[in-house]
């Protein structure tokens, strides 16, 4: 069945994807050059759904292997608004998006973390890589406060 996909067909290299993500994590700056103002990055990564609602309240999860509870939407990214409700490891305020063939990235500003996962699994729910990847990444962190 046909459908409109505004983000469909985007292509990048892993290196360019990382450069873009690092620029976002650094508040719009990369290699000493400002591409976006910090305010623009803040606006992009804030939940803009009406009334602060979540994706779970407004849509169905057609392609994502993870649910949308505790997740809002910014200007181009899903945004975690309630990490407990999302039932995914992460932080409130982390932002992410996935693509075709199970590609996925997320940025966690609180942990100064970027994760980019490029694979080719179709359909996207062939294997639950997003949940498992997040679990593995966050479980590898050491508690430096102990």
PLM-predicted stretches and their roles:
Residues 1-146:
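Catalytic loop of the DD-peptidase/beta-lactamase superfamily, centered on the K-T-G motif
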């Amino acid at each position: 069945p046909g459908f409109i996909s505004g983000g469909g067909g985007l292509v990048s290299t892993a290196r360019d994807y990382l450069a873009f993500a690092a620029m976002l994590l650094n508040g719009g700056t990369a290699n000493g050059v400002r591409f976006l103002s910090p305010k623009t990055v803040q606006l992009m990564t804030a939940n803009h759904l009406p009334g602060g609602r979540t994706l779970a309240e407004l849509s169905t999860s057609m392609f994502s292997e993870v649910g949308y509870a505790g997740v809002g939407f910014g200007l181009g990214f899903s945004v975690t608004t309630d990490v407990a409700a999302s039932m995914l490891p992460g932080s409130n305020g982390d932002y992410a998006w996935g693509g075709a063939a199970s590609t996925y990235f997320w940025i966690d500003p609180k942990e100064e973390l970027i994760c980019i996962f490029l694979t080719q699994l179709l359909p996207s729910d062939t294997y639950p890589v997003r949940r498992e990847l997040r679990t593995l990444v966050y479980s590898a962190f050491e508690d430096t406060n102990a």
